[in-house]
Curated annotation (Swiss-Prot):
Keywords from the named record: Acute phase, Antibiotic, Antimicrobial, Antioxidant, Disease variant, Disulfide bond, Glycoprotein, Hemoglobin-binding, Immunity, Repeat, Secreted, Serine protease homolog, Signal, Sushi
Record-annotated disulphide pairs: 52-86, 111-145, 149-266, 309-340, 351-381
Organism: Homo sapiens (Human)
Top-level lineage group: Eukaryota
Gene Ontology, cellular component aspect: blood microparticle; endocytic vesicle lumen; extracellular exosome; extracellular region; extracellular space; haptoglobin-hemoglobin complex; specific granule lumen; tertiary granule lumen
Record's protein name: Haptoglobin
Residues in Peptidase S1 domain copies: 162-404
Keyword rRNA-binding: no
Localisation: Secreted
Residues glycosylated per entry: 184, 207, 211, 241
Length: 406
């Protein structure tokens, strides 16, 4: 007569409370489970099954069943004496079935606050017969989340009114960065995505010789975003024609986390630098007392007529008669890559240290802020009538190409 084995499974909740034992092991603990009766020509094999509490599930390669061996060890066939673990089960309950129908399992990917889906599909994936999650538009390619740009939580109020400018409300200019040179000179930079910023070539060359390279410059800079959040610089890239196009890019070692204090500004798909259009410029530059400010300020400035701006800085009313004269003793770069913005009606203006900041324009239809220009000439300080900005649309191809290659 063949031997007959019997298995007793004790259901346990996340941990082993007690086990029964045969003749060779200790008697049962006082959990109320009776000792099983013996049978002729057979024996009792002691085993337990680990189970988890509600909303938890087993994390194990085995089935959770452990058998007591001759050495009084609890052993699982798949994992030996390694105990299973319980982990949170965030799965959905099985939906009820319907007559003449079936349940199609699908999930929708969504992004956290201040991020949006970057995908050709709608983010909805369906489980196919091969147990693969498939999107109708992109197949098994997963979507990505990218930073929202140009959507400040507390946008600047035009009713509120850096030279004598207005204090920034919380998060009005989350793209504004503060850059400090190795000789402790403060300038500006503008966040345009999670890892790249625009600034001027002049800012990058501060206290460096003309022979300095991008590799020489990067280690000498200190950069802050948000509320004095220090970020590490990986490299700087100068525009190939930076003597005429006063611009450079900064790449960070790590992507920044986007939130209400840190958010890139959008790059425009059209030119917003129309005469009379008002933009906002923020910065930590010098104030009316010619001292650097500890508080981010901003000012509203109108785009000026380019010809008038050129005549103003040439010191002549006739454009053909070029002279080195300038109301502030320094000649700005003025060409097809630049535009000018005049002082506000309150005689407010940008000043030393504001260069690298964005001329931010609010597109009311899209409710989005765009970097129309990057402040290049910040020496006006309410003495000259115009500040000079590098036009972002004229450098956008270079910006996108540089980011893609680096």
């Amino acid at each position: 007569m063949s031997a007959l084995g019997a298995v007793i499974a004790l259901l346990l909740w996340g941990q082993l409370f007690a086990v029964d034992s045969g003749n060779d092991v200790t008697d049962i603990a006082d959990d109320g489970c009776p000792k099983p009766p013996e049978i002729a020509h057979g024996y009792v094999e002691h085993s337990v099954r680990y189970q988890c509490k509600n909303y938890y599930k087993l994390r194990t390669e085995g089935d959770g069943v452990y058998t007591l061996n001759d050495k009084k060890q609890w052993i699982n066939k798949a994992v030996g004496d390694k105990l299973p673990e319980c982990e949170a089960d965030d799965g959905c309950p099985k939906p009820p079935e319907i007559a003449h129908g079936y349940v199609e399992h699908s999930v929708r990917y969504q992004c956290k606050n201040y991020y949006k889906l970057r995908t050709e599909g709608d983010g909805v994936y369906t489980l196919n017969n091969e147990k693969q999650w498939i999107n109708k538009a992109v197949g098994d390619k997963l979507p990505e989340c990218e930073a929202v740009c140009g959507k400040p939580k507390n946008p600047a109020n035009p009713v509120q009114r850096i030279l004598g400018g207005h204090l920034d409300a919380k998060g009005s200019f989350p793209w504004q960065a503060k850059m400090v040179s190795h000789h402790n000179l403060t300038t500006g930079a503008t966040l345009i995505n999670e890892q790249w910023l625009l600034t001027t070539a002049k800012n990058l060359f501060l206290n460096h010789s003309e022979n300095a390279t991008a590799k020489d410059i990067a280690p000498t800079l200190t950069l802050y975003v948000g509320k004095k959040q220090l970020v590490e610089i990986e490299k700087v890239v100068l525009h190939p024609n930076y003597s005429q196009v006063d611009i450079g890019l900064i790449k960070l070692k790590q992507k920044v986390s986007v939130n209400e204090r840190v958010m890139p500004i959008c790059l425009p798909s059209k030119d917003y630098a129309e005469v009379g259009r008002v933009g906002y410029v923020s910065g930590w530059g010098r104030n009316a007392n010619f001292k650097f400010t500890d508080h981010l300020k901003y000012v509203m400035l109108p785009v000026a007529d380019q010809d008038q701006c050129i005549r103003h800085y040439e010191g002549s009313t006739v454009p053909e008669k070029k002279t080195p004269k300038s109301p502030v003793g320094v000649q700005p770069i003025l060409n097809e890559h630049t535009f000018c913005a005049g002082m506000s009606k309150y005689q407010e203006d940008t000043c030393y240290g504001d260069a690298g900041s964005a001329f931010a324009v609010h597109d009311l239809e899209e409710d989005t802020w765009y970097a129309t220009g990057i402040l290049s000439f910040d020496k006006s300080c309410a003495v000259a009538e115009y500040g000079v900005y590098v036009k972002v649309t004229s450098i956008q191809d270079w910006v996108q190409k540089t980011i893609a290659e680096n």
